[in-house]
């Protein structure tokens, strides 16, 4: 079986190095090629990968991972290059924590959780280029909270009780790498490795890569989990510059799946006899959340402070108008026209990212703190607008009175930047602009695209 998917050209891969990259667009590729300690199931719960089982002590400060003994590294041709052991995770962690090697990328999770990790990172930073000569043995000698008690057992010691550490250890900061590969490529060479010279331990290897065009994967013939999963004979990702052409490609059988935008869905549903009505299905939410972040020190294009915006956004009542009054259903419909409010997420993380030791999903705990724990999707009203039914008349008056008194003029203009020459991005932004108009009134806040 072959499968053809797609990705936007603005999300082309920039780095093949799993330890170095911090881009989700890179990890969409490399997670098909590299395996770490754990993976996640379709519900966001941690499941075995290279680690077949794991446990922790009573206060969740010490975590033990037992590894499989049948994992090999292969090259781009699927030829076995080395056997994977616990040492490879030590080498990988030292690479991440070494400022001379990984240039501070992906350090936050180990630095925040592991004993001695932040100190070791600082040591390598202070050493400058000389730190490139350090090895995983130097990391262990420095007291970083990790040890390989044998070839297939890893033990991590956290600075504090960390009941969610298994989800942390699943992140790229803790991925393995073979010391032999780093020796073969050198520090600079490994940091800049690509699909032709990197080693793989995941389900696929790369058959072909043409930047901004296509990338094709074929099964890794020596994948340790081959008997446990189903794989495509070839999996191809086509890069598309404008999402408006995906439906045409799907109709031409040049794509096997596509995201159906609002306009395309309207076209399909307008014809009850359309064959595509039977092919519609709701897409599973991704683990990534999307937020609006306020800039509290915005500058104008000439570099001078945008005092009008900066004063406005510093006002509590002004900000609360966004929280309690911005109605986004029509904007969500650009992603999910049938059930737009399923796109609502009122938390920093997405549901399913992590669970505590009692099996409670993290965002449910946040919902309780925010007073949302009794609320549920109803398909009619955004959860955060239910308390006041989106009525911000009093807040708006308060904000305008307080801000007028300190010289703010109205409407306040909020800048919203999009990708140039991308018609889909422009259409989405235009709908968002109308949401601002409907929610705030153009006498109060105007969205500038």
Q: What residue ranges belong to the model's regions?
A:
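Extracellular/periplasmic solute-recognition and catalytic clefts
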Residues: 9, 207-221, 236-303, 329, ...
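Append "and occasionally in soluble cytosolic enzymes with long acidic Gly/Pro-rich linkers
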Residues: 218, 313-439
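Short, well-ordered beta-strand elements
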Residues: 1-10, 61-66, 89-92, 154, ...
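Surface-exposed binding/hinge segments that line
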Residues: 88, 95-182
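N-terminal lobe/hinge region of extracytoplasmic solute-binding protein
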Residues: 6-58, 199
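Aromatic- and charge-enriched surface segment that lines or borders ligand/interaction sites
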Residues: 52-117, 155, 246, 309-314, ...
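Gly/Pro-rich hinge or "lid" segments in bacterial periplasmic/extracellular proteins
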Residues: 132, 140-142, 150-151, 157-236, ...
């Amino acid at each position: 079986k072959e499968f053809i998917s797609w990705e936007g050209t603005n999300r082309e891969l920039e780095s093949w190095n799993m330890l170095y990259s911090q881009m989700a667009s890179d990890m969409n590729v490399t997670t098909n090629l590299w395996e770490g300690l754990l993976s996640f199931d379709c519900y966001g719960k941690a499941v075995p990968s290279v680690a077949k089982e794991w446990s922790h002590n009573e206060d969740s400060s010490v975590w033990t991972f037992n590894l499989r003994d049948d994992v090999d590294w292969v090259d781009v041709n699927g030829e076995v290059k080395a056997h994977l052991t616990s040492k490879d995770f030590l080498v990988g962690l030292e690479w991440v924590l070494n400022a001379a090697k990984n240039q501070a990328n992906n350090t936050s999770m180990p630095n925040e959780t592991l004993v001695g990790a932040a100190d070791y990172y600082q040591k390598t930073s202070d050493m400058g280029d000389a730190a490139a000569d350090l090895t995983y043995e130097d990391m262990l000698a420095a007291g970083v909270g990790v040890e390989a008690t044998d070839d297939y057992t890893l033990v991590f010691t956290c600075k504090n009780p960390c009941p969610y550490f298994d989800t942390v250890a699943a992140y790229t900061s803790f991925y393995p790498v073979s010391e032999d590969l780093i020796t073969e490529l050198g520090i600079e060479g490994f940091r800049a490795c690509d699909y032709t010279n990197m080693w793989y331990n995941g389900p696929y290897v790369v058959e072909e890569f043409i930047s901004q065009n296509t990338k094709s994967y074929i099964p890794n013939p020596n994948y340790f989990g081959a008997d446990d999963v189903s794989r495509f004979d070839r999996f191809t990702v086509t890069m598309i510059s404008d999402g408006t052409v995906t439906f045409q490609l799907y109709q031409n059988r040049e794509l096997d799946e596509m995201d159906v935008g609002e306009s395309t869905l309207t076209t399909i549903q307008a014809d009850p006899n359309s064959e595509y009505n039977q092919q519609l299905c709701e897409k599973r939410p991704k683990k990534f959340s999307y937020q609006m972040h306020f800039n509290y020190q915005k500058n104008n294009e000439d570099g001078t402070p945008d005092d009008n915006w900066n004063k406005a956004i510093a006002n509590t009542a002004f900000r609360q108008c966004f929280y309690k009054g911005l109605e986004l259903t029509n904007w969500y419909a650009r992603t999910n026209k049938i059930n737009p409010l399923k796109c609502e997420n009122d938390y920093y993380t997405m549901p399913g990212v992590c669970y505590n030791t009692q099996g409670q999903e993290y965002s449910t705990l946040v919902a309780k703190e925010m007073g949302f724990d009794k609320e549920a999707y109803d398909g009619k009203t955004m959860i955060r607008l239910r308390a006041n039914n989106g009525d911000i008349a009093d807040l708006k008056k308060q904000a305008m009175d307080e801000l007028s008194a300190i010289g703010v003029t109205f409407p306040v203009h909020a800048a919203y930047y999009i990708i140039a020459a991308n018609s889909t991005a422009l259409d989405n932004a235009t709908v968002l602009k109308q949401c601002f108009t409907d929610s705030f009134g153009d006498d109060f806040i105007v969205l500038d695209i």
